[in-house]
Swiss-Prot record:
Subcellular location: Cytoplasm
Record gene name: hutH
SUPFAM superfamilies reported in the protein's UniProt record: L-aspartase-like
Protein name listed in UniProt: Histidine ammonia-lyase
Post-translational modification, as annotated: Contains an active site 4-methylidene-imidazol-5-one (MIO), which is formed autocatalytically by cyclization and dehydration of residues Ala-Ser-Gly.
UniProt organism field: Bradyrhizobium sp. (strain ORS 278)
Residues joined by cross-link 5-imidazolinone (Ala-Gly): A142-G144
Length: 515
């Protein structure tokens, strides 16, 4: 995959998704002069008599301690080593790579005061597959993601640990394996590298990418459930959505209509159906999935903006030569965005679980056998699969509680309000795993329901989706070991197979975009 030439301030959602998928990133040539100009301002300040935070002073509560010029390099090294306090399992490699890319973008804005060789080192590590071991826990999202970014920076200076070709080795060995030497940090460079929101933002973006794919899958399984339940598609008509006007609702209604279009099941009950209205889990899909889409779209705007931002402290104003302390490291926007994503994930699971419950209940599923097994009683069918979906939804509901309201003072009360953005973003991945299983269960249940509607068939798009499922999981004719079926269905959901199959049948990309 070719490297993306980054224009800091203008990196797109799709660019970030490509980095998450494995692309490297390189700073565009037009941005180097500003990087070097900011570094020159810092170098001059380091030799001056005036105290400048993080350049010739201590850090945090120790900012009043002056550091002589001959100890500024040691100051930065000590900062990195002392801040490597992360705990817990390793952050997944795609997220670490995205974090490094975000740091390159931030430094490339030319307001951090680092030398070119610092950015070059990050670019080389990213391009050559040096992935620092970054523990998942230890950041409160202000003053930036200090501990996680310190673990990244430790590898740059030959310390810490990194993965190379799947092996965890000492940082110096990892660099040598790809022909790199450790760098020596100059004034402010350690602080610029660890002060920022890149860990939280990378985790939140990764959660957003997964949420986008899960939303698309939920639209597909929601359409399958509509046909399996012989529900009405009239509530999806564009006139209904337009009268409310929310963009996500309009898009969701359109997708649901396109997916079911041409279904013989639908045509079979256009007339003579005594039911006046369907349950909300079927009828209100545009309103719920659409609201989730709008939340994800808003979160995408916030996170793309943050990905292009300068979030360390202090910042260098090249035009005036000033070095100004601020608070861009506070990750409240990221925490809010992560909380929004969590709400969307939770509600997509909530309504999917209700559709599953509707389809397995003979009082609600309009003529299908109990728990969708041809021989109920002897067989239990999808009885406990629905219970599993309920259990997973309950977990996600608890995880969806906002993390951004849970501040606690740190650093001798100097950092007295924090965002908890890292925790807010990390929990998205457990939620996404749960949601993939919930939607996977709906896929199994709805496909079974449609196949029990013979001789009537579903639409071309939904038939293609069922075909993709059946290449991995056969229909449930009698009880069997179910865990493998659930795992395979969840993998199809998480991997985007449902939307791809539908798009091939439709001959176009019918699903909404976030960026």
């Amino acid at each position: 995959m070719n490297a993306i030439i980054a224009e800091p301030g203008h990196v797109s959602f799709d660019d970030l998704a490509r980095v998450y998928a494995g692309a490297a990133i390189a700073l565009g040539p037009a941005y180097w002069p500003r990087v070097e100009a900011a570094a020159a301002i810092v170098a001059k300040a380091a030799q001056g008599a005036e105290p400048v935070y993080g350049i010739n002073t201590g850090f945090g509560k120790l900012a009043s301690k002056r550091i002589p010029p001959d100890q500024t390099a040691l100051l930065q090294r000590n900062l990195i080593l002392s801040h490597c306090c992360g705990v817990g399992p390793a952050t997944p490699e795609p997220i670490v790579r995205l974090m490094i890319a975000l740091k390159i973008i931030s430094l490339g804005r030319g307001a951090s005061g680092v030398r070119r060789q610092i950015v070059d080192q990050l670019q080389a590590m990213l391009a050559q597959g040096v992935c620092p071991f970054v523990p998942q826990q230890g950041s409160v999202g202000a003053s930036g993601d200090l501990a996680p970014l310190a673990h990244m920076t430790a590898v740059m200076i030959g310390e810490g640990q990194a993965f190379v070709e799947g092996r965890l080795v000492p940082g110096r060995e990892a660099l040598a394996h790809v022909g790199l030497d450790p760098v020596t940090l100059g004034p402010k460079e350690g602080l610029a590298l660890i002060n920022g929101t890149q860990f939280s933002t990378a985790y939140a973006l990764a959660g957003l990418f997964r949420a986008r794919d899960l939303l698309n899958a939920a639209l597909v399984t929601g359409a399958l459930s509509v046909d399996a339940a012989m529900a009405s598609t009239a509530p999806f008509r564009p006139e209904i959505q337009a009268l409310r006007g929310h963009p996500g609702q309009i898009a969701a209604g359109r997708v649901l209509t396109e997916l079911v279009d041409g279904s013989a099941i639908r045509l079979s009950h256009l007339e003579g159906d005594e039911r006046v209205q369907d349950p909300y889990c079927l009828r209100c899909q545009p309103q719920v999935a659409g609201a989730a889409l709008d939340l994800l779209t808003q979160a995408a705007r916030t996170l793309v903006n943050e990905a292009n931002a300068v979030t360390d402290n202090p910042l260098v104003l090249v035009e005036t030569g000033e070095i100004i302390s601020g608070g861009n490291f506070h990750a409240e926007p990221v925490a809010f965005a992560a909380d929004q994503i969590a709400l969307a994930l939770s509600e997509l699971g909530a309504i999917s679980e209700r559709r599953i419950a509707t389809l397995v209940d003979p009082a609600l599923n309009f003529g299908l056998p109990p728990f969708l097994t041809p021989q109920p009683g002897l067989n239990s069918g999808f009885m406990i699969a629905e219970v599993t979906a309920a259990a997973l939804f309950a977990e996600n509901k608890q995880r969806a509680l906002p993390c951004s309201i849970d501040s606690t003072p740190t650093s001798a009360n100097q950092e007295d309000h924090v965002s908890m953005a890292a925790h807010a973003a990390r929990r998205l991945h457990d939620m996404a795993d749960n949601l993939a299983h919930i939607i996977g269960i709906e896929l199994l249940v709805a496909a079974q329901g449609i196949e029990l509607r013979v001789p009537h068939g579903t639409s071309a798009a939904l038939s293609a989706v069922i075909g993709a499922l059946r290449s991995h999981v056969p229909a449930l004719e009698s009880d069997r070991y179910m865990a493998d079926d659930l795992a395979k269905a969840a993998a199809l959901v998480a991997g985007g197979a449902l939307a791809r199959a539908a798009n091939v049948a439709l001959g176009r990309d019918s699903f909404p975009r976030l960026g």
